[in-house]
Amino acid sequence: MLEQMGKAAKAASYQLAVLNTAQKDRALLTIADLLEVESATILAANVLDLADARQNGMSEALLDRLLLTQERLSAIASDVRQVCRLTDPVGQVIDGSMLDNGLKLERRRVPLGVVGVIYEARPNVTIDVASLCLKTGNAVILRGGKETYRTNAATVKVIQQALSQCDLPAAAVQAIESPDRELVNQLLKLDRYIDMLIPRGGAGLHKLCREQSTIPVITGGIGVCHIYADDSIDFDKALTVIESAKVQRPSACNSLETLLVNRSIADRFLPELSKKMAASGVTLHASSLAMPYLTSGPANVVAVEDANYNDEWLSNDLNVTLVDDLDAAVAHIREHGTQHSDAILTRSLSNAERFVREVDSSAVYVNASTRFTDGGQFGLGAEVAVSTQKLHARGPMGLEALTTYKWIGYGDDLIRA
């Protein structure tokens, strides 16, 4: 089955690669319209997925991720229309020159070809990824979580219907509808057809893909994000940033997981932190250094375990520890971070510049929340993932990250001397 899907996707990718922007945008607008027209079918499939998930004991937080409503589906359709407004990177000339040997050489953006995406219980990802791949002339094979396989199947059917209406190959967007996990292992070996694989899930999925895939893999999305509050901060402003980074959306990969506080301000700052976190319902996992300053405060406090510093909580939990200086903060981030998003709160320009130079994460912030690591917030539009590696993309992956380039040389019956 997957062999046939791969062949069909590769054939479709050749057709997509030569489409102009107007043709791709027409397909996207048709998809957006049909999502609204066929919303009842998609929502009915989602109801069945929700019922199974609830019966299997899925938490309310995860059920909410899985849930589609008419309002949410309309918002997803609106997001597809927004992709139409983004600049198409395909065909852009990155650079070019006339060489001494007479060759006019340029580097031009082109689609990757076929993208494979493995993701979990978020039905909106199906549309987000499909729309970005189509905009960049890529075919895509989707493998959503077993919790959403009915919703994904119904959604992809609508997308394929829209593609057919636009005289484009339905195989440009395909989904593996079976929840059989063995098919994931088979997908990882389709290097003959798939040019890039993107896993969007937990550490286990990323490890599986890195170890088993014969396809180039873009990993990321696992965010053990830090904020370092140095000794020059404005307490009120810093507390506002810390609170927002933790509680705005705790389940997001760019939410704050560990707070590092300069030891010299601990006796004054941590009691204020306790009040702020108590009001937001955050449990503090305090080190032995931080604990004495937090035990008398209103926040729920427990002793941190060493392993917690590597935890992506994705909940109203926050590690808190003290460091002597910037060197110690950077060392902690290097040991426990995932190169996702890390920030410093400071009024010291030299500390800010050092932090930016020395913290090797895909996004580094000065006096700003880690929550900004997002395609929409970066002005990239939607994103297919957040990459924490260095090749071939890093940070939020928008349209450009779904392209590569080719060298094109022009001559006048030119031969090499």
UniProtKB/Swiss-Prot annotation:
<dbReference type="GO" id="GO:0055129">
    <property type="term" value="P:L-proline biosynthetic process"/>
</dbReference>
<keyword id="KW-0560">Oxidoreductase</keyword>
<dbReference type="InterPro" id="IPR016162">
    <property type="entry name" value="Ald_DH_N"/>
</dbReference>
<dbReference type="InterPro" id="IPR016163">
    <property type="entry name" value="Ald_DH_C"/>
</dbReference>
<dbReference type="GO" id="GO:0004350">
    <property type="term" value="F:glutamate-5-semialdehyde dehydrogenase activity"/>
</dbReference>
<protein>
    <recommendedName>
        <fullName>Gamma-glutamyl phosphate reductase</fullName>
        <ecNumber>1.2.1.41</ecNumber>
    </recommendedName>
</protein>
<dbReference type="GO" id="GO:0050661">
    <property type="term" value="F:NADP binding"/>
</dbReference>
<dbReference type="Pfam" id="PF00171">
    <property type="entry name" value="Aldedh"/>
</dbReference>
<dbReference type="InterPro" id="IPR000965">
    <property type="entry name" value="GPR_dom"/>
</dbReference>
<keyword id="KW-0641">Proline biosynthesis</keyword>
<comment type="similarity">
    <text>Belongs to the gamma-glutamyl phosphate reductase family.</text>
</comment>
<dbReference type="InterPro" id="IPR012134">
    <property type="entry name" value="Glu-5-SA_DH"/>
</dbReference>
<comment type="function">
    <text>Catalyzes the NADPH-dependent reduction of L-glutamate 5-phosphate into L-glutamate 5-semialdehyde and phosphate. The product spontaneously undergoes cyclization to form 1-pyrroline-5-carboxylate.</text>
</comment>
<dbReference type="GO" id="GO:0005737">
    <property type="term" value="C:cytoplasm"/>
</dbReference>
<dbReference type="InterPro" id="IPR015590">
    <property type="entry name" value="Aldehyde_DH_dom"/>
</dbReference>
<dbReference type="InterPro" id="IPR016161">
    <property type="entry name" value="Ald_DH/histidinol_DH"/>
</dbReference>
<keyword id="KW-0521">NADP</keyword>
<comment type="pathway">
    <text>Amino-acid biosynthesis; L-proline biosynthesis; L-glutamate 5-semialdehyde from L-glutamate: step 2/2.</text>
</comment>
<keyword id="KW-0963">Cytoplasm</keyword>
<keyword id="KW-0028">Amino-acid biosynthesis</keyword>
<dbReference type="InterPro" id="IPR020593">
    <property type="entry name" value="G-glutamylP_reductase_CS"/>
</dbReference>
